[in-house]
Amino acid sequence: MLDFEKPLFEIKNKIESLKESQEKNDVDLQEEIDMLEASLARETEKVYTNLKPWDRVQLARLQERPTSLDYIPHIFDSFIELHGDRNYRDDPAMIGGIGYLNGQAVTVVGQQRGKDTKDNIYRNFGMAHPEGYRKALRLMKQAEKFNRPIFSFIDTKGAYPGKAAEERGQSESIARNLVEMASLTVPVISIVIGEGGSGGALGLGITNRILMLENSTYSVISPEGASALLWKDSNLAKIAAETMKITAEDLYELNIADEVIKEPLGGAHHDVETQAQSIKRTFESHLSELNQLTQEELVEDRYQKFRTIGSYTE
């Protein structure tokens, strides 16, 4: 339960208590229950339609939030996962493979968090090593060779900053992805489904279209990290979250995100199937547009997208 959800849980507990009392004592409390349920519906709508940036950060980080592998089977047909970077090892924090979207063969890559403690240790909490980024690039270059569109799922706090990862060329692997993705001659679409953190997210983010789920975030650093650097106090993360403009709505207004995909009330974890179908429809719409472009136009479209991000004064 998140802090901003506490009032809702208090009402839910009262409803459950009344229902138990009604059943146990054989008394009619239905009128009170109906009133509380109506109140819960109103409060739920009020809470989730007025979320602050820090609230969305908390939702993006939820353990229960759907991961790449939760969405993929609902969106792509006959998905087959492929493994390894053909150099060092297979990185479980980065998944990828091939499947079909409306009969068209596509390549899918994405960061993968764990669903529980054991799985998170196996997946390294979604923080990929260099071999993860090299695996993703191998699959993207394969997609280019066979003229398959690419879909990337961004969901990471950042690339793994450990000593071994740095020794194996973490920064080089991400930089290589940026260079190579910029010149891919097939449609490339990314979606931020949770946290999109730092260069670890950008390593899958040089795409023709950047989509974001309503409660996802995309930033160069976490709010805690930003507040510690700027104000020497990580407790000011709430203020940093507002200042940094990291929410989907903010990034859409800044022309960084191309579309914000609505989530079920309360977050994507409340209805994975509905959320997946919404993502699928959005993928189909953007892919239909990009399929009309030539290879040269796709590269130019991607180039212009990133050239026009941001503002400057002379």
UniProtKB/Swiss-Prot annotation:
Residues 32-289 form the CoA carboxyltransferase C-terminal domain. One of its GO terms (biological process) is malonyl-CoA biosynthetic process. Pfam families: ACCA (PF03255). GO terms for molecular function: acetyl-CoA carboxylase activity; ATP binding; carboxyl- or carbamoyltransferase activity. Component of the acetyl coenzyme A carboxylase (ACC) complex. First, biotin carboxylase catalyzes the carboxylation of biotin on its carrier protein (BCCP) and then the CO(2) group is transferred by the carboxyltransferase to acetyl-CoA to form malonyl-CoA. The keyword Cytoplasm applies. Its EC number is 2.1.3.15. One of its GO terms (cellular component) is acetyl-CoA carboxylase complex. It catalyses: N(6)-carboxybiotinyl-L-lysyl-[protein] + acetyl-CoA = N(6)-biotinyl-L-lysyl-[protein] + malonyl-CoA. Pathway: Lipid metabolism; malonyl-CoA biosynthesis; malonyl-CoA from acetyl-CoA: step 1/1. Belongs to the AccA family. This is Acetyl-coenzyme A carboxylase carboxyl transferase subunit alpha. It is found in: Cytoplasm. InterPro entries: Acetyl_CoA_COase_a_su (IPR001095), ClpP/crotonase-like_dom_sf (IPR029045), COA_CT_C (IPR011763). The lineage of its organism: Bacteria, Bacillati, Bacillota, Bacilli, Bacillales. It comes from Staphylococcus saprophyticus subsp. saprophyticus (strain ATCC 15305 / DSM 20229 / NCIMB 8711 / NCTC 7292 / S-41). Its main location: cytoplasm. Acetyl-CoA carboxylase is a heterohexamer composed of biotin carboxyl carrier protein (AccB), biotin carboxylase (AccC) and two subunits each of ACCase subunit alpha (AccA) and ACCase subunit beta (AccD). Keywords: ATP-binding, Cytoplasm, Fatty acid biosynthesis, Fatty acid metabolism, Lipid biosynthesis, Lipid metabolism, Nucleotide-binding, Transferase. PANTHER family: ACETYL-COENZYME A CARBOXYLASE CARBOXYL TRANSFERASE SUBUNIT ALPHA, ACETYL-COENZYME A CARBOXYLASE CARBOXYL TRANSFERASE SUBUNIT ALPHA, CHLOROPLASTIC. It is an enzyme of class 2 (transferase).
